[in-house]
């Protein structure tokens, strides 16, 4: 059924249909009785899916990835739609319009998206107001990054300002230094630059802090960031952001679309490689959140058994539809029961343990 609906939705430009569908979701879930009904139908209800991660209780491991709800306008929607949590943002200290449109494109033959949104958002102050005025039913993380207009010399202060505004209202914070759509941002993944940013954010908030990394960095850079995260006692790492690689894409005319980060199945292989490397280096000393190319319950299960405590999706939601979170959670629950696992936590990294 959703295939037919998706075909119709895809007749409209991506950013336009995103705005329309998001408005509809907010409207429906603004009604308490409908919100409760949706959560009863779609929500992760099996207790085996619940886990406590960095002191936060998650009813299910699959969350909405950053980028869909940039300004926290749908805080009440995500639990009702079956997600175990949501990460809102990316938000910057100051409002900014992002890059010129068109800036989002579908790659249907790859079941992928290409975006160069450029962190369009209303600013951390506006998001703080949203967070203060709503009580979501699931944990809400906030993804923060640098305002494009902020000089490099004030980068740390920019991140600190965002952390100061939204930190007290978030379940956790993610420091984003890995988007390909802000000039120079990925350079901040260099350890000495990243150290200063993370120390600044940690000084501003008491909530768990994670860092989000790119799939396109080298293995040695991954190791350096991982060691820094352990040294600074971060809560964890989100892996990975979108990729700039165009390898193996089959959608015609991709070069004509211009620059941007690609999400969905084309990033899946590298996302798994990064996850396995991270878990092999730190085990359970850091919480690992895996994102990138998760489409099916099998994909989700592979990430969990490879070491991910939590998962995120965005492109899978676009291509999979409103029942996608439920299908993923139901599939994970079934595999937990079939495998004799008493809890989700028991399954995390289990494939790695068996291979040793």
Swiss-Prot record:
Protein name, UniProt field: Dihydroorotate dehydrogenase (quinone)
Taxonomy of the source species: Bacteria, Bacillati, Actinomycetota, Actinomycetes, Mycobacteriales
Origin: domain of life: Bacteria
GO BP terms in the entry: 'de novo' pyrimidine nucleobase biosynthetic process; 'de novo' UMP biosynthetic process
Chief place of localization: membrane
Membrane found in the keyword field: yes
Topology with respect to the bilayer: Peripheral membrane protein
Subunit: Monomer.
Catalytic residues in the record: 179 (nucleophile)
Gene name as annotated: pyrD
Annotated residues for binding of FMN: 66-70, 90, 143, 176, 212, 240, 264, 293, 314-315
